[in-house]
Amino acid sequence: MEEWVRLQLLPEDNPQNWFSGVVTQQLYEKFLMLDKRNEGTLNAANLKLYKKGLPTVIDDGLPLDVSPLSTLFIDRYFETNVMMSGAEMDFRKFVDFVIAMETLPSCSRPHFFWKILDIEGTGVLTPMIVNSFFRETHAKLLSAGLDIPSRETIVQEVFDLIPTAQPLLVTREEFIQSSQAGLFTALIIDCLSFWTYENREQR
């Protein structure tokens, strides 16, 4: 993970142009890497092997068959994207997914992430819900031998990112309106984003 953090903390002289030929090729190669069945579509099992970066960073400090993204997040993505026939993702949907993941913690689509995070459909996020996503992220960080605080401490800190009317309770409106919605999401569903954030003072 240290190499991933080093890459993320490098100055970005050339912001990603998502419409360039080079990026299109990298996106297609990433898609083919995950399409183990050669079906031209991806299912949840395929996407649970997702590795970040364009071009894809395979050596991210995690086992080859472990994605930095929470499997619960991926399952919820498929559950909430009702436009996907037969719970399969085509290349167009894949590109949308990649852009959403690779631009975190920036977030131009808070509604997209809210639908995924609101497991109970109640319009509020509680520590129990956040911990459901973060549990796996925390385990991956520990497995990588990293020294990090307890889950309870981090969940508390994550809730502090978003101004709320009630402590430890984020409503849909508070999430959508917050400039920290992307960071809130990234820290609980992506172990690489979490570790990069923890090392942000090195920038």
List where the protein language model places each region.
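Amphipathic regulatory helices of Ca2+-sensor modules
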Residues: 1-8, 41-69, 88-102, 124-143, ...
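Detector for Asparagine
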Residues: 14-17, 38, 43-46, 81, ...
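Long, highly charged low-complexity segments
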Residues: 16-26, 68-73, 101, 109, ...
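Primarily EF-hand calcium-binding motifs
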Residues: 23-39, 48-51, 61-65, 69-99, ...
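Solenoidal tandem-repeat scaffolds enriched in leucines and small polar residues
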Residues: 1-20, 24-28
